[in-house]
Amino acid sequence: MSLYDVTVNIQLQKVVKRLDFGIPLIMTAGVTASPAQEGQEQQTPVTHAYAEYTSIQQVKEVFGDSDIISVIAASIFKQENAPKRIACCTTTATNLNALKAVKDQNWRQLILTSLDWDGESKDLTDVFDWCEENKRVLFTSTKSTTKFTDFSAKKGTYHHIVVLYYNDTTEQVVFPEAAVVGATAGKKVGSITYKNQILAGVLPMVLEESELKTYHDAGCITIVSKAGDIVTSEGKALSGQYLDITDSMDWLEQQLRYKVQKVLNNNDKVEYTDRGINLLEGAAISVLKEAYDNGMIAEDPDGLPMYWAKFAKREETEAADRV
């Protein structure tokens, strides 16, 4: 037997994968039955529970070719960098109750076909507030900004609400926000801005610069033509904050919580020692590094990433906390 002064200890570690950031959801709430024909009983509303789909063919098999869900799904899947999966759901519940029912599902971007800009302002603000509180990004479109005065006092807080001004007099395009979702949801978080995203299957608005400024000042974005491409005019949410910043902040919070929790799950015991603290710190740093690699974190003048994780060593903590 050979003798060695070196001992090699190899341990197989579990790789903590990234948690999915969520997929687009197309939802119709308040579904009602078709009017009963003379001599026939009233029909039961046809609804479809939350489910995920990987192609427009799968969506059409469930909803049919002409249903608005299928039309929106087709626009999403038509984009060059479309997401690999989307979710669809129809329900008799109200908009707000419908959202509450799918809160724990794996979705992030929302197209709510039953959101009525001509209806009660409270319905809009209830949906906006819920999406903001639960960090889900609502994409919606309107032909007018007059309704904005009803929630102007809170407009600056809506970092997760994207309003598209779109007045297509030909009515060839319905739910133009679907193209925006399809063009962006399949890309890495932090790797894009939402401005100048190339869109397929939609018509551009023809606006004077002063008109465009008016809509941007109101918190809207729209669809325009630039250098021969049809693109988004701006990349901000209703609050005026860039949507990629909101995405990055939400992603960091989600991934930090997830990866630190996985450390606790994958170890029978994470001791309150420097070693245990280092395990948690390592998980946090791995998230921050990925965020930097994806363009979410800037560099300092020396070209170094501007992030750090400060976990107090055991000796730096209060004695009472170590009991």
Region annotations inferred by a language model:
Residues 1-323:
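Surface-exposed assembly/interface segments
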